[in-house]
């Protein structure tokens, strides 16, 4: 089913674009939440009239994301965890741990925004991406330090 996105949907595309989706996804998710409308000739004309407004909204969102990226760039987040004598963690550092550590520094991000490339199971420094907008993904450093040595 062809639909026109009325707002940016992360998995599909930017507002104002026409995409093909499963009919059930359109009927049960996109249409009730007013995130998309059916791609009829009348709706295409309506979207052309709204295109300038949508482009302005996209520019604002991208600008806000780029400002936030400047603040996040170069941030080092330190997390202490219990480790063994070999430097391996008991368990692992999760996305939730990273979100909590950033919240302690007055940086608000959701778990969905944190892009963890690998499981963190050892002491060290790891690069972690923070998804802010489609092409705005600043990297922070997460440093895992030993809390106390286990016997």
From Swiss-Prot:
Alphabetized GO MF terms: rRNA binding; structural constituent of ribosome
Organism superkingdom: Bacteria
InterPro entries: Ribosomal_bL9 (IPR000244), Ribosomal_bL9/RNase_H1_N (IPR009027), Ribosomal_bL9_bac/chp (IPR020594), Ribosomal_bL9_C (IPR020069), Ribosomal_bL9_C_sf (IPR036791), Ribosomal_bL9_N (IPR020070), Ribosomal_bL9_N_sf (IPR036935)
GO terms, biological process: translation
Entry keyword set: Ribonucleoprotein, Ribosomal protein, RNA-binding, rRNA-binding
GO CC terms, sorted: ribonucleoprotein complex; ribosome
Family membership noted in the UniProt record: Belongs to the bacterial ribosomal protein bL9 family.
Free-text function comment from the UniProt entry: Binds to the 23S rRNA.
Name of the molecule in the record: Large ribosomal subunit protein bL9
Species for this entry: Desulfosudis oleivorans (strain DSM 6200 / JCM 39069 / Hxd3) (Desulfococcus oleovorans)
């Amino acid at each position: 089913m062809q639909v026109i996105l009325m707002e940016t949907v992360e998995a599909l595309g930017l507002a104002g674009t026409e995409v093909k989706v499963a009919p059930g996804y359109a009927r049960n998710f996109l249409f009730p939440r007013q995130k998309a409308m059916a791609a009829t000739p009348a709706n295409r004309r309506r979207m052309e009239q709204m295109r300038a407004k949508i482009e302005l909204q996209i520019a604002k969102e991208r600008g806000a994301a780029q400002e936030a990226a400047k603040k996040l760039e170069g941030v080092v987040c330190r997390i202490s965890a219990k480790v063994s004598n070999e430097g391996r963690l008991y368990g692992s550092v999760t996305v939730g741990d990273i979100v909590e550590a950033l919240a302690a520094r007055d940086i608000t991000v959701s778990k969905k925004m944190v892009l963890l490339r690998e499981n963190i199971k050892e002491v060290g420094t790891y690069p972690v991406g923070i998804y802010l907008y489609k092409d705005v993904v600043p990297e922070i450093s997460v440093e895992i330090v030993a809390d106390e040595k286990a016997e």
